[in-house]
Amino acid sequence: LTDATAEKHDSFVGRGEMGSIIEIFSGEVLVQQEPDASSFPSGGIRNTFEARGYTAWDVSSPAFIVGNTLCIPTVFVSYTGEALDYKTPLLRSLAVLDKAAVDVCHLFDKDVKKVIATLGWEQEYFLIDEALYYARPDLMLADRTLMGHPSSKDQQLSDHYFGSIPDRVKAFMKEFEFEAYKLGIPVKTRHNEVAPNQFECAPVFEEANLAVDHNQLIMDVMRRVARKHKFRVLF
């Protein structure tokens, strides 16, 4: 529940005959695993043995490869079934929306079987030079400007909007877009935004659950690529 991606890595290592080590990956492991959730706040209402969390394969979102790691999108729920992530309530709401929309469609066409929600997100972000970032404790601690001049409002800097993209920023954009394409994220648009050092990227719209996964994933990619270009990215 950090508004960012989370991950748990498991190897394919298993025990073979006579104690030997083999690579194995079963369907049972793919469908559900039991990571520890005891470190999450519970208000003291749970015993430690009841503080388990379960990951379950989200088959509606495709797996992808990062480096040499196979990444499998999952939901994360508690021992008693409460959502410990934002994907679980999203999937539940999409299912409810599908059912309600199909009922409405049946008033006009009885052959409608399913309604798929799509989403076309756009990700705005600020790029801060690494040296300037480390000079600001508010940025380092909160990723927000908590002191200094008030932010620009009322479009005073509209000349920056849709203006020429600086070469250093363009190099960053090209690299993170290339990495995004390798992960199947269909990035289509990039441009300056209205505030100083503010920019935007946007993909082709997709099925809502997949679009949200891609949005979270591209922010993770942008953070990694920004460091290579001596930037820090703020969302």
Regions found by a protein language model. Name each.
Residues F12-F235:
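Glycine-rich, acidic/polar active-site loops that bind/position phosphate-bearing ligands
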Residues T2-A6, S11:
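Short linear motifs in low-complexity or flexible loops
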